[in-house]
């Protein structure tokens, strides 16, 4: 029979239940080995996330030397994001069913191979196809990273692990443009983009031996369930239809609206199908009882809105600084480094505090992010060509970055704290899919506002940047409003339950 809500609220870390045998995690790891395994997971997450930001800087070089059309140029970046998002939930289920370590290793091998294919691409089509495959590989790895952290750490220690994970997200976003700009400057624009992919390869390979040796095994307690292939297909079509309109350039034509509405309709079909599968006592692709946990679905919405907000600022600022103020990619990246440093530092701090402070960290963090982005928009809107933008934006971006860092680790810890370990990778896949959709929405919103205002103002880059950044700030404000009920009586009880879980529940693996 399908699980009841109590299966999620009462025993968040039980290995399974009678209806659906769960994942039996390996014995608890020694502290030193667990720290080493954490480093492996963080390294893999860093590489898959770095691929997005570092390649963006190389896009003009790839456009020129492979004769990419505008559509191909968009797909070389957006296609990676799309297939990354598509793979997250099915690969999360694969990890829960067949073992997170196995799926992690397969994903890293594929990520390495596709990096080689990108580096040696000789045509635009070759590059785009390799980028699509690379996104699938990254999507195989990402849910296993979170699932493994969920598996390796008892609840009272997960906040710290997720703090390091959140810092990794922030660092990869900022280091990518800096590193990409440095590589292009060192190797030249003709072949520099190839070196970006080539330098990934030894790093990817370096992750494999320690992963094979250190990562814990997970296995099914009884006979494996058959995979929900119909659910995977319907969900894949739904996510594609929702994300494609957000990733395409240009205005919102009738076709893009139809795609978006079709995607939402397919999501409804997916929910009905998953309920049908659960009623037949089979294992669905996504156990919908996850969404009976208020902390989980609220946390997923907060993550989607927040990632949409702070992703949008990079799109706008890089365009403004390079096109409007004629900064080099490297110099433009330096202007945003304080956001990253603040986010990384506060991510680690948040991970250490979440089990003592709870939900208020998310409230304060989203508020700081929204205020910081709004202040950045006002500063940029009043700027002139001779201004030192690093100094003008320093405090607002630092505030926004610190706010984002407070949210990332705390929100993920609170969202997943009552998820059973047997569902760890699947729950992470759903959570990260929400992040990807939010990221795509933020990119589309900020870009549309920026270029729309640029056209309307006849080339006023400052006004365009202000408008785009206000759009990003609006998404951060949405994250704040979604998280705000955490200060109500029920929200305080949810936070207390989270702390209670970390104090009482012992690890099984």
Regions found by a protein language model. Give the residues of each.
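Helix-breaking motifs and short loop linkers at transmembrane-helix boundaries and internal kinks
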Residues: 65-67, 99, 120-126, 326, ...
